[in-house]
Amino acid sequence: MSHPMAGTAGTPGTPRVLRAMNDRTALDLLLEHGPLSRTRIGKLTGLSKPTASQLLARLEAAGLVLATGTTEGRPGPNAQLYEVNPSVAHAAGLDVTPQRIRAAVADITGRTVGHHELPTPGRRTAVPVVQQVTDALDGAVKAAGLSRSDVHRLVIGTPGAFDPNTGRLRYASHLPGWHSPTLLDELAAALPMPFEYENDVNLVALAEQRLGAARDHSDFVLLWNQEGLGAALVLGGRLHRGWTGGAGEVGFLPVPGTPLVRQVTKANSGGFQELAGSQAVPRLARELGIGNIPQGPYTEAAAALLERAAAAPDEGSHRRLLQTYATRLATGLASLVSVLDPELVVLSGTGLTSGGEVLRTLVQSELEELAAPRPRLVVGDVREHPVLRGALESALATTRDEVFDTSR
């Protein structure tokens, strides 16, 4: 497996730059494999034993690696093991929804060390958004036994997207308090660390690309269905955000089978959302005569119905629910794959993953009937707080590039 090098200063090919490249390769190997001996690092990098020893001594002196334990159970003397120093830097992520802000802090190895969830006040609140952000972050930082100043970088995930041309949040009218034109400046003044913002579904795609079903794939679409219906587009290995950040806002897409929704951003909905969003599942179940529909939030009701339907016999109302829902999903997805022709489509969010392989198979079959491209469909692997996991992965990637750069 290849290991990307950090950006380095200086002239390419100089000993300083080559040492920095070797350092980064070794650090990436330690992140991937866990504790390694000098001999093992030498074999994985192709470096001689003396060079590997110098490298580890250099990284240990810089505080980037720690000596930890020894190998046991092998012939010969026990070998010293080395690992990345987990406390060398920390990164944080936030997942913002209308209901709550979820925050987490991870050490540089990716291990989550602090977590906090803050209920988000309703539209009529005296608590400014900046205070909501700092309160959520402080809760996670405190749980990790750290302070704000210990966090190297923060990534904030929200519905919609901040338009890079105006600095204002778009496509998320249901997120109260986040639409001020000065919000980003206010956050920058309140936070001691650099921060970035990203669309929540884009962060799920990043999590799947780094940790889950889209590893080793550079062209894929992630379809998300939970509180809202959206997509993330990864083209040539990079997220495609569009001119205003709105690429992938497919919930607004007009589709057959539902009335046209006009002024979609004011309505905060569109044809595909109305046809196949999670809120449509309980309604469809009632139309099919399915009883015992769960009460409570529609996301939870939809997930429970889909899980029940996937476990039901192949015939009957539950199977008709899955078949009809699969057709609706494929109707909108066909437009996406016809334009983008991706290698892979990842299904994520409880409005999709709860149907498991049964729903995936039905959507795959329907899509093959409706679109010329035939990408492979898979169910996403990152199920636990995927937006937050993506935010942490994004923050960690930049943090590692900065902290692991030994050329400076």
Model-derived features: positions:
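ATP-binding/phosphotransfer module of carbohydrate and carboxylate kinases, centering on a glycine-rich
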Residues: M1-T70, R74-P121, T125-S147, T258-R408
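Short glycine-aspartate micro-motif
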Residues: A91-D95, V151-V155, F220-W224, G230-A232
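Short, glycine/acidic-enriched loop or turn micro-motifs at the edges of active sites
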Residues: P98, L203, E227
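Short, acidic, Ser/Thr-enriched surface-loop or helix-capping motifs
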Residues: D107, P164, V234
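Glycine-rich phosphate-binding loop and adjoining helix at the ATP-binding site
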Residues: T112-D219, V358-E369
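Short, active-site-adjacent cap segments at secondary-structure transitions
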Residues: A161-P164, N202-A205, G230, H240, ...
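Glycine-rich phosphate-binding loop of actin/hexokinase-like ATP-binding domains
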Residues: H217-A276
